[in-house]
């Protein structure tokens, strides 16, 4: 990164959690700009996060701003959009969030931004494609969060069956971040052993289904998912 400056668009639970994670990990980031369609929400989050700097492991400049501040940002993280509600699939959000996205991307590009977009907003795969389309940036400059969250859930679930630390499990969900995602069992291992030799097929199938539906279960219970993605 040239300026070590990141903009987070959307200061709801996910956006705020990403900002919080950045100031609590020793990263290369030295400036965070928060922006939201509700300007005073971004201002309030910036004020709250600045107070945390007194006890954070490193100093990061934090401010609220507008899309114009994207001009010299290295990365713009897109978290803005309607949140998934109980009973909704990620694809149910498409029309609402696609409409929000286009105007947002156009304003960011008007600032002169030429960095990298990191897209978190659901349905993430489609929103990542639309960000590339609306921005005109090459594919290597528009990145989705992918199945990194799903893979973390997979490792945790496998670890619970094998009674090991999730960090010692190497396993991946692939494909869409959504209902068609798949578990790459052939590469899953822990401690040098293939998971397929330790867990029967019916258990593995149950784990795959559990991981695929985990988001719906969490949303039914607490409405929002904010803990894992900011850390990964």
Predicted regions and their residues:
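NAD(P)+-binding Rossmann beta1-loop-alpha1 motif at the extreme N-terminus of oxidoreductases
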Residues: 1-43
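Short, well-ordered alpha-helices that flank and scaffold nucleotide-derived cofactor binding pockets
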Residues: 20-24, 51, 106, 133, ...
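Short glycine/serine/threonine-rich phosphate/pyrophosphate-binding segments
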Residues: 14-19, 86, 124-129
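C-terminal substrate-binding/catalytic lobe of Rossmann-fold NAD(P)-dependent dehydrogenases
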Residues: 135-141, 150-232
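Conserved N-terminal Rossmann-fold NAD(P) cofactor-binding segment
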Residues: 31, 35-72, 88
């Amino acid at each position: 990164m040239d300026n070590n400056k990141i903009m987070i668009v959307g200061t709801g639970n996910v956006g705020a959690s990403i900002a919080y994670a950045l100031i609590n990990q020793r990263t290369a980031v030295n400036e965070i700009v928060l922006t939201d369609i509700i300007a005073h929400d971004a201002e309030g989050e910036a004020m709250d996060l600045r107070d945390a700097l007194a006890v954070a492991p490193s100093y990061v400049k934090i401010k609220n701003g507008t899309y114009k501040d994207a001009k010299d940002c290295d990365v713009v993280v897109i978290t803005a959009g309607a949140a998934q509600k109980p009973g909704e699939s990620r694809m149910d959000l498409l029309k609402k969030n696609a409409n929000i996205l286009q105007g947002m991307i156009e304003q960011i590009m008007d600032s002169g931004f030429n960095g990298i977009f990191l897209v978190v907003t659901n349905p993430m795969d489609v929103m990542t494609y639309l960000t590339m389309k609306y921005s005109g940036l090459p594919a290597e400059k528009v990145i989705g969060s992918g199945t990194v969250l799903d893979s973390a859930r997979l490792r945790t679930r496998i670890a619970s069956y094998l009674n090991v630390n999730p960090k010692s499990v190497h396993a991946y969900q692939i494909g869409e971040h959504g209902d068609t995602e798949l578990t790459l069992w052939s590469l899953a291992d822990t401690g040098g052993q293939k998971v397929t030799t330790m867990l029967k097929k019916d258990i593995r199938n149950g784990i795959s289904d559990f991981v695929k539906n985990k988001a719906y279960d969490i949303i039914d219970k607490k409405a929002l998912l904010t803990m894992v993605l900011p850390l990964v």
